[in-house]
From Swiss-Prot:
Residues 1-18 have a biased composition (Basic residues). One of its GO terms (molecular function) is structural constituent of ribosome. Residues 1-26 are annotated as: Disordered. The keyword Ribonucleoprotein applies. GO terms for biological process: translation. NCBIfam families: PRK04306.1. This is Large ribosomal subunit protein eL21. It comes from Metallosphaera sedula (strain ATCC 51363 / DSM 5348 / JCM 9185 / NBRC 15509 / TH2). Coiled coil: none annotated. Keywords: Ribonucleoprotein, Ribosomal protein. Belongs to the eukaryotic ribosomal protein eL21 family. It comes from the Archaea.
Amino acid sequence: MVKHSRGNRTRSRKLLKKSPRERGAVPSLGRLMLDLKEGERVVIKINSSTHSGMPHRRYQGKVGTILGKRGKSYEVKVKLGDKEKILIVRPEHLNQIKA
């Protein structure tokens, strides 16, 4: 018997699927150059066509706050159960919440 692999994208067939209109589209320049301030609230929306800076699928749809910037990525604090996690996520995978 062969041991079944459990990679980072297992069980994500529907979760990371794009709609036919979005398929093949690369993130727009505005989305890549998104300037987020510390303390802003964001939603993690994974863009499956960009692999760098992609958070784990368990964080898809979670709301977090920006702690700071680390290189091209942002540090995002997310509450998961009763714990708080700090993720390092690229801006392609973040959506700003309009206040």
